[in-house]
C-alpha cells in the first residue's frame, strides 16, 4: 500500500539576514556555503501494508511533518522511491476546504468532493455526517457563524465518512469536548478495523499505543526504531528522561 525506499528530502538552509556591510565582510563565507541544504529526511525506508496502522513519533524537527507532506503528495522527495497505492484522505488541517459564507450542508458536499467522493456519494452520506457532527440545528447556517468546536466537528465528520483507503492523521484527536474526542477516536478505530491503512503522527504516546499496531520513531531525519508500539514508545520515553 505504501512503499518508501531510501527517501531523502532537503530544504535550502536558513540564512541570517545581513545588512550590506555584513554581507560584504562575509561574502567569502556566503559563496563557500551557498549550496548548503538542510536534510529533513535522510535515507529512510519502510513499507506499510493494507489495513496496518502505523504511528510516527519524534520530537519537533525530527521529520514527521515532512514525511507526512510527502505521503500526502504536497511535497516531493529530493531522491528515493515513494510508491503509494490508494486514495489518501488527510486529517491534518480540518476544514481547509470549507467556504465561510456557505452553509454547513453546502460545505459537506464541497469538502466531500475535495476528498475524492462524487456529489451523489456524499449526498447519500450527508444525513449520517450531520448526525455524527451533532450540529443538526445549525447545518443550514453559514459556517462563519459556527464556533471553532462546531466547525471542527463538522470537518471531522466529513473526513471520516468519505470511505478513505489511506488515512493520514496529524494530531487531530483533540476535536471538540471530551465526549466528542472519545467518539472521534472510536470512529478512527472503526476505520482501521475495516481495513483502512492509517499513518498517525502524534505527540500523545497514550493515543499512539491505543490506536497503532506499529510505531516508527524518527530522530533527526532517520528512523531510530520501528516495531511494537509498547517497545518503541518505551525506548523513546526512556531517552527523553
Model-inferred region functions:
Residues 226-227:
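ABC ATPase "signature
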Residues 23-28, 109, 121-138:
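Conserved ABC ATPase "signature" region
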Residues 3-39, 230-234, 238-241:
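Pre-NBD coupling/linker segments of ABC/ABC-like ATPases
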Residues 208-210:
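A short, surface-exposed alpha-helical micro-motif characterized by mixed small hydrophobic
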Residues 202-203:
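H-loop/switch region of ABC-family ATPase nucleotide-binding domains
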Residues 57-59:
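The feature captures the beta-strand-to-loop junction immediately N-terminal to the Walker
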Residues 220-221, 236:
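Conserved ABC ATPase "signature" C-loop
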Amino acid at each position: 500500500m505504501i512503499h518508501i525506499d531510501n527517501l531523502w528530502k532537503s530544504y535550502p538552509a536558513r540564512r541570517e539576514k545581513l545588512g550590506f556591510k555584513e554581507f560584504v565582510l562575509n561574502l567569502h563565507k556566503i559563496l563557500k556555503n551557498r549550496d548548503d541544504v538542510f536534510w529533513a529526511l535522510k535515507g529512510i525506508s519502510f513499507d506499510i501494508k493494507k489495513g496496518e496502522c502505523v504511528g510516527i513519533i519524534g520530537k519537533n524537527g525530527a521529520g514527521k511533518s515532512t514525511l507526512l507532506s510527502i505521503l500526502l503528495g504536497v511535497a516531493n522527495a529530493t531522491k528515493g522511491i515513494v510508491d503509494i497505492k490508494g486514495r489518501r484522505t488527510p486529517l491534518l488541517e480540518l476544514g481547509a476546504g470549507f467556504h465561510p459564507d456557505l452553509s454547513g450542508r453546502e460545505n459537506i458536499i464541497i469538502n466531500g468532493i475535495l476528498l475524492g467522493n462524487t456529489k451523489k456519494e456524499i449526498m447519500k452520506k450527508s444525513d449520517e455526517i450531520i448526525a455524527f457532527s451533532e450540529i443538526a440545528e445549525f447545518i443550514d447556517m453559514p459556517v462563519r457563524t459556527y464556533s471553532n468546536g462546531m466547525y471542527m466537528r463538522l470537518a471531522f465528520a466529513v473526513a471520516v465518512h468519505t470511505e478513505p483507503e489511506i488515512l493520514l492523521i496529524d494530531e487531530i484527536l483533540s476535536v471538540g469536548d471530551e465526549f466528542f474526542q472519545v467518539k472521534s477516536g472510536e470512529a478512527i478505530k472503526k476505520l482501521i478495523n475495516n481495513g483502512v491503512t492509517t499513518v498517525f503522527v502524534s505527540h500523545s504516546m497514550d493515543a499512539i499505543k491505543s490506536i497503532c499496531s506499529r510505531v516508527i520513531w524518527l530522530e533527526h531525519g532517520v528512523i531510530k526504531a520501528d516495531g511494537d508500539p509498547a517497545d518503541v514508545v518505551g525506548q523513546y520515553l526512556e531517552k527523553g528522561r
